[in-house]
Amino acid sequence: MRSSASATATRPTVVQFFITCLLDHLYPDIAEACVTVLERAGVRVEVPPGQTCCGQPAFNGGFLAEARQMARHFLAVFAETTGPIVTPSGSCASMVVHHYPGLFAGEPAHQARAEAVARRIREFGQFLVEDLELRYVGGRPGRYTYHPGCHLSRELGVRGCAETLLAGIPGAELRPLPEAEACCGFGGLFAVKLPTVSAAMMQRKLENIAASGAETCVVCDASCMTHLNGGLVRQGRAPMVRHLAEILAEVGP
């Protein structure tokens, strides 16, 4: 870990916020929670106007020309900014980091721009722990368990950040999640193409969440949250899956 003096000198003070489609259209409260937490940590949050979808749904569906068009727009918006690009979605972050450069193979100028932007992408929890070196930034006591999203943990290789922040909440108990590494069954278009398999995976994940004894299951992707809470509601149960930012934005007992 860096010394406190060097950490203070190098820690980012301004970030660009990549809001994602789900938060922009369905969960603006989670976006607001992200801003609350970042500002509490002493970071100014800028939201570049004109940002749209990163193109992941089109890419996953095989519509590469359409995905490339959306990626060009994304790069045009964010390449003109400076500083880290923070996003509350490991899935969308992974799209930019791992798939944008390949989308522009044969287009050196766009590929170079994609690689430059990709180097600036930071997932929300990752930024708090790895860049700001925080261990506590907010949250209330409770029994939590954590479901690591596939793209965040496997493609980005980000592990332990959310757990660190949850464990740092005074009075919080972090319960282990059985089969934590197993997918929740969403997988974007996977849930549409193979709904029966997706539903079975979701049910197993819900059973494991219940077995953890936690009051709240925390995720870092709104897509996982939507999928799991949708399953709970269809079973007549109360939603209990929440985004990490929502948890950290709360302060006090």
Question: What feature does the model see in each segment?
Answer:
Residues 1-253:
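Iron-sulfur cluster-binding electron-transfer modules in prokaryotic oxidoreductases
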